[in-house]
């Protein structure tokens, strides 16, 4: 089961809004492609590489300048996936606080 954090939902909305300023159709395509890649994690939760933050994974989205930060086995359930963030590859991640 895949769940989205409130931050990941916000990320998707911001990605959509940014692209939609120039092309609503492209925004739908990009967000749709991101969601398709995320859905694959339901069957292949270890598909991403080890993340830069402990206990996370990062999934690159082929052909798009975005990556998905997620956790597998949330709440002790091996089949659960939590999407933490969806970020542009140009972002400084993780941010230093």
Q: How would you label these PLM feature ranges?
A:
Residues 1-55, 76:
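Basic, Lys/Arg-enriched alpha-helical interface segments
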Residues 35, 63-64:
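Σ70-family region 2.3-2.4 aromatic/basic alpha-helix that recognizes the −10 promoter
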Residues 61, 67, 71-97:
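Enriched for short, Lys/Arg-rich terminal
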């Amino acid at each position: 089961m895949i769940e989205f954090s409130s931050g990941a939902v916000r990320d998707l909305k911001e990605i959509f809004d940014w692209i939609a300023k120039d092309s609503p159709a492209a925004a739908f395509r990009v967000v749709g492609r991101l969601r398709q890649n995320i859905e694959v994690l339901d069957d292949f939760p270890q598909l991403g590489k080890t993340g830069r933050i402990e206990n996370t994974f990062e999934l690159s989205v082929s052909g798009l300048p975005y990556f998905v930060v997620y956790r597998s086995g949330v709440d002790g359930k091996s089949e659960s996936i939590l999407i933490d963030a969806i970020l542009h590859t140009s972002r400084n991640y993780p941010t230093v606080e």
